[in-house]
């Protein structure tokens, strides 16, 4: 099983709501707003954490390959 994730974020942009900037996460109600919150940066962490939890619980799984890159997934040059 291939688990893919990229760590890059989109460039800082305008259009944020008042009090919501691109670099400081803010909790409003039950929602967390922050830079890259809707991007893929935490998918790799979630995948690795899930594999670890499964192993610690004694579960079995197929061979997992985790691919993490730091470039934009639509135009990776390296």
Predicted regions and their residues:
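Active-site metal-coordination/substrate-binding segment of hydrolases
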Residues: 2-65
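Histidine/acidic-residue-rich, glycine-tolerant segments that coordinate divalent metal ions
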Residues: 61-78
């Amino acid at each position: 099983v291939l688990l893919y994730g990229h760590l890059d974020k989109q460039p800082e942009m305008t259009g944020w709501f008042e009090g919501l900037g691109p670099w400081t996460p803010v909790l409003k109600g039950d929602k967390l707003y922050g830079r890259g919150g809707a991007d893929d940066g935490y998918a790799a962490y979630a995948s690795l954490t899930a594999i670890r939890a499964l192993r610690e619980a004694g579960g079995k799984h197929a061979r997992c390959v985790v691919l993490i890159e730091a470039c934009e997934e639509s135009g990776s040059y390296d």
